[in-house]
């Protein structure tokens, strides 16, 4: 099988297996290829008033939480440190909902009602981006991890989660 190396895109290269008898070696790809450790993903709410960018890998590690809020909304968490999140527009369109301890700040677009990101209780110095609100074109794959949000304190015994990005 002949491969046109010049026509391959980065996602195609990621899928190449190295080391097996029927695969291509790293030297065939060439040392000039660089696969970025992270990608800038853009996204926003339904009406478009709230827009943001988030820096994360192209293959996302997402948390699926079983708490009442996440289950009802279908939220899939991409949790990032604050310095990897940038709100581009819509600050004046956001409204905040808090409950229980008040640590988590659930931010909703006051026009369309979508929660595209928020400040989670588990990561109060970062953001949880709703992966369902990311624009098409930059995500190459997703790995889902179940999180026990119903028993939050047991899931995060030290009171804070770690970042995967």
Stretch-by-stretch model annotation:
Residues 14-17, 22-165:
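A short Gly-Trp-Pro
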